[in-house]
Amino acid sequence: MRYPSTANSAVSMRSTEELLLSNGTAGKMNGALEHSDQPDPDAIKMFVGQIPRSWSEKELKELFEPYGAVYQINILRDRSQNPPQSKGCCFVTFYTRKAALEAQNALHNIKTLTGMHHPIQMKPADSEKSNAVEDRKLFIGMVSKKCNENDIRVMFSPYGQIEECRILRGPDGLSRGCAFVTFSTRAMAQNAIKAMHQSQTMEGCSSPMVVKFADTQKDKEQRRLQQQLAQQMQQLNSASAWGSLTGLTGLTPQYLALLQQATSSSNLGAFSGIQQMAGMNALQLQNLATLAAAAAAAQSSASPSTASALTSSTGSLGALASPAGSTANSSAAMGSLGSLGTLQGLAGATVGLNNINALAGSVNSMAALNGGLGSTGLSNGSAGPMDALTQAYSGIQQYAAAALPTLYSQSLLQQQSAAGSQKEGPEGANLFIYHLPQEFGDQDILQMFMPFGNVVSAKVFIDKQTNLSKCFGFVSYDNPVSAQAAIQAMNGFQIGMKRLKVQLKRSKNDSKPY
């Protein structure tokens, strides 16, 4: 074929021998070479930037040929100048897709040409995106293991030209019951899906044939991110709901800070529900986390200053956990809870059950969180640090072993109905969350924020025209303390490449929009 003379110089080349046999046309500004062959059907036209403006097709050919035979090079030129001058970029087409990708891997953002300040930029041209292989490639599932490639071609050829057909096989060479078919155009692939999807049940298959577009790299990446998120959520739920001491010590910095805020504002009423065992809430988890932190800190340090800090801190914890609401105990808790800040630096130490057992020594049975804290040893801080930790650990044992699994199950059932609801909680208990992943729904956001308290509603907003997520939503709790715990734990929480933004929803009286 022959390319017409244009302002964008075009030189087609296959080898040095062809250049020598071209009657000198390659030396012309707009020279073109005749070829009897064509590039592979899946060849990629690549855009290349950051090349010297003084370079001609000859220099570019020498740059690209080490990676494979070059079919065509087009230098982009500024037509407003006479003669047209190079814009410092070009298009190159190799005969094979493999050569183009190898050149991209070796040059893109790696090699800087003489006289240039930035490395070469090499990527598929925009025109290639509309006809990418992944847009025309089909996955065929529930295929009879007796079928071969020719059988699949015969089955799908009525819907258009097939460029590639491949059956997936195991190491033993036997079919895995699925295949990939690549058509010449996306329209052909779509026609095949409409006609063939679930159209028949093949021999040896349990369900009808599946015909759909094959997963793209983007789809695979999204699935990987979803799996990572599921693992993170599982760890979060386990740490905050099932009484895992190791997990709880990892969460204590947020809870300790929250407890300090409550005590600094003299809000003892916020803790009134701790002794009630009818339902799980975030405050009970905060108590458990703080007790675990105290035990971990005592086990990991033997310095006098640490022991002193723990003595005062564990004393206040006992008062906090006690159902006895006496004024004296409340005052003691108010005066000594300020020392919880000391525990924040120690909460990172993890401690196993065996270590706590060794630390506790002889355990005197006490129900620290189950309503049985009758002694004043913890509330007035007069008991020794080891006694206080022994009692605290006894409470953890009883609480985690007897109550927490049941309470978690009850709470889980109660909160499932919150997904999709737009019911609001009290002032200061409503959260606005954005930077949510596109694929997140109401159930996902509910599962994410359940560990911090009783959720009354969880809603992801959907665009009515596109039916796609707007990537933001609302979560409401039944109390402001749970909302603050969620903010401290989840604001900045990374999901894939995104970091969540979690903040309080503005009051209805606020004239500013959300």
From Swiss-Prot:
Localization (cell): Nucleus; Cytoplasm
Extent of the signal sequence: none
Cross-referenced SMART domains: RRM (SM00360)
Keyword Nucleus set for record: yes
Pfam family name, one: RRM_1
GO molecular function: mRNA 3'-UTR binding
Keyword entries, A-Z: Cytoplasm, mRNA processing, Nucleus, Repeat, Repressor, RNA-binding
The keyword Repressor is assigned to this record: yes
GO biological process: mRNA splice site recognition; regulation of alternative mRNA splicing, via spliceosome
GO cellular component terms listed in the entry, alphabetical order: cytoplasm; nucleus; ribonucleoprotein complex
InterPro entries reported for this sequence: CELF1/2_RRM1, CELF1/2_RRM2, CELF1/2_RRM3, Hud_Sxl_RNA, Nucleotide-bd_a/b_plait_sf, RBD_domain_sf, RRM_dom
Function: RNA-binding protein implicated in the regulation of several post-transcriptional events. May be involved in pre-mRNA alternative splicing, mRNA translation repression and stability.
Similarity comment: family membership: Belongs to the CELF/BRUNOL family.
Protein name stated in the entry: CUGBP Elav-like family member 2
Organism of derivation: Danio rerio
Gene from which this protein is expressed: celf2
